[in-house]
């Protein structure tokens, strides 16, 4: 059996049983199993107040967040074993990032937050939720991704079903549980973790509190929360200030914003600004609440350029674009010219943002101001964009033509070889 080496099972990093958990400091093996395992370990450490065990799982989490986390919140870089590679192995065209692994990452980060009250875990949870996880299902709800590569040389599309059909059922189950991630309660502390419109009734001590949240987040940073206790009562409301609003895309140096300015954040109670008092990434509002109280959170959402740690060699010369918690992808289906995207040094400004209901219902499209080349390699779609002056030998053009003429190799080998020729592997 796993962990015991019985019934013919060999202890291995694949199953995370190559050494006792208390001695581990790197996340290895099958990504989904790792996320589920360490979710359970976090629970056990919390329930048993086992500091050594929690320190071990926190070391593993730090390794994941600082060396093995994709910008979209996905985990698991290797198709082989559906798992992790060495530190900083974050390739873009041949990565795996299974949908189930993103779900497991949400589970794990939620438990790490519950054990500590630290918002950094919710920052990773939110990034994964809005990018790596939700991409696993189509807007129509009937097609799914098993793996989620950051880029593809064409041909990678959502499927209606899989021989190993863990992801469709898992993502369906998860979507129904999202309301449970919005708030958390610890005695007289109420945490506002996610910004999602809706009504919730919470039990805070012996007081029933109704919270009505109104927002269009993540499309803008305006949030209103109506607080209605059934009686006047003193308790603390902790409103999370997301990492992206504090000039930090992830809680490590794995990714940083090129544009160094901090978005402006304001918190008002009944129209009056509150004195800034933070705890573990939360804006703390301690007061006696009464019916009719309203909390207003406003966060600027500039377009941000993101670069990876220099040790991620696959991302050298590359930038990503984000706005708020959303990582943007380039739509390239109508880009007929074989060319590269180029971003200049000056900040990028958003010109407008809209929903094209006739095309894809709830999907939002953004247009950008400023000098930039908007053409792309036909058939490619990648979340990262190339900076000017990098790989000017036309290798991307020749690689693509070579792929189109290849008829005997499998898709995965084509993708892998293309990445190697382009310098991404």
Language model regions located:
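Long, well-ordered core segments of solenoidal/helical folds
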Residues: 1-11, 56-73, 127-138
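Solvent-exposed loop and edge beta-strand segments that line ligand/cofactor-binding
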Residues: 2-52, 69-78, 82-102, 156-168
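Well-ordered alpha-helical scaffold segments within catalytic/enzyme domains
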Residues: 36-51, 89, 93, 104-117, ...
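Short, solvent-exposed positions on alpha-helices
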Residues: 51-55, 119-123
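C-terminal beta-rich recognition modules with glycine/proline-rich loops and embedded aromatic residues
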Residues: 57, 123-131, 136-229, 246-269, ...
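Extracellular Ig-like/FN3 beta-sandwich strand-entry sites
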Residues: 234, 292-294
């Amino acid at each position: 059996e796993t962990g015991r080496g019985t019934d013919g099972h060999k202890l291995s990093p694949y199953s995370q049983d190559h050494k006792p958990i208390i001695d581990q400091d790197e996340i290895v093996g099958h990504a989904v199993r790792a996320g589920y395992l360490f979710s359970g370990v976090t629970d056990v450490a919390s329930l048993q107040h086992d500091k050594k065990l929690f320190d071990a799982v926190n070391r593993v989490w730090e390794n994941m967040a600082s060396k093995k986390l994709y910008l979209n919140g996905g985990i698991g870089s290797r198709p082989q074993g559906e798992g992790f590679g060495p530190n900083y192995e974050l390739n873009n065209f041949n990565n795996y990032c299974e949908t189930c692994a993103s779900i497991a990452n949400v589970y794990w980060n939620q438990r790490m937050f519950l054990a500590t009250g630290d918002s950094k875990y919710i920052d990773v949870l939110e990034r994964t939720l809005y990018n790596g996880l939700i991409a696993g299902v189509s807007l129509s709800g009937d097609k799914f991704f098993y793996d989620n590569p950051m880029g593809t040389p064409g041909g990678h599309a959502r499927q209606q079903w899989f021989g190993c059909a863990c992801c469709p059922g898992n993502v369906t189950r998860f979507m129904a549980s999202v309301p449970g991630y919005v708030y958390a309660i610890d005695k007289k502390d109420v945490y506002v973790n996610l910004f999602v419109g809706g009504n919730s009734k919470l039990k805070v001590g012996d007081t029933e509190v109704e919270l009505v949240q109104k927002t269009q987040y993540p499309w803008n940073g305006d949030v209103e929360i109506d607080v209605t206790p059934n009686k006047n009562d003193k308790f603390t409301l902790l409103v999370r200030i997301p990492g992206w609003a504090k000039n930090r895309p992830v809680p490590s140096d794995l990714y940083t914003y090129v544009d160094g300015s901090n978005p402006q954040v304001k918190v008002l109670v009944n129209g009056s600004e509150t004195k800034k008092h933070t705890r573990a990434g939360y804006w703390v509002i301690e007061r006696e609440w009464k019916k009719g109280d309203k909390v207003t959170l406003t966060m600027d959402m500039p377009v941000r350029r993101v670069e990876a740690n220099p040790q991620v060699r696959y991302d050298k010369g590359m930038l990503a674009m984000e706005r708020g918690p959303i990582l943007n992808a380039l739509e390239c289906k109508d880009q007929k010219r074989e060319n590269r995207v180029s971003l200049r040094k000056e900040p990028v400004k958003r010109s407008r943002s809209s929903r094209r209901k006739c095309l894809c219902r709830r999907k939002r499209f953004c247009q950008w101001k400023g000098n930039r080349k908007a053409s792309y390699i036909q058939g490619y779609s990648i979340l990262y964009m190339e900076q000017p002056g990098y790989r000017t030998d036309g290798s991307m053009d020749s690689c693509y033509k070579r792929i189109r003429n290849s008829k005997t190799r499998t898709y995965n080998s084509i993708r892998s070889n293309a990445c190697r020729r382009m310098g991404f592997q």
